[in-house]
Amino acid sequence: GILDTIKSIASKVWNSKTVQDLKRKGINWVANKLGVSPQAA
């Protein structure tokens, strides 16, 4: 159904390279603000 289609698209977007890069940058930014290394999180 339409919901499955939306879920499928959302999953593809979420797992796309661009989003992965943004998530990593976001995590790094937050980690820097908190003064912790991303590896520790």
Swiss-Prot record:
InterPro entries: Antimicrobial_7. GO terms for biological process: defense response to bacterium; hemolysis in another organism. Keywords: Antibiotic, Antimicrobial, Cytolysis, Hemolysis, Secreted. It is found in: Secreted. Expressed by the venom gland. GO terms for cellular component: extracellular region. It holds the Pfam family Antimicrobial_7. It comes from the Eukaryota. Antimicrobial activity against S.typhimurium, K.pneumoniae, E.cloacae, P.aeruginosa, E.coli and S.marcescens. Also shows hemolytic activity when tested in human erythrocytes. Belongs to the non-disulfide-bridged peptide (NDBP) superfamily. Long chain multifunctional peptide (group 2) family. This is Hadrurin. It comes from Hoffmannihadrurus aztecus. The lineage of its organism: Eukaryota, Metazoa, Ecdysozoa, Arthropoda, Chelicerata.
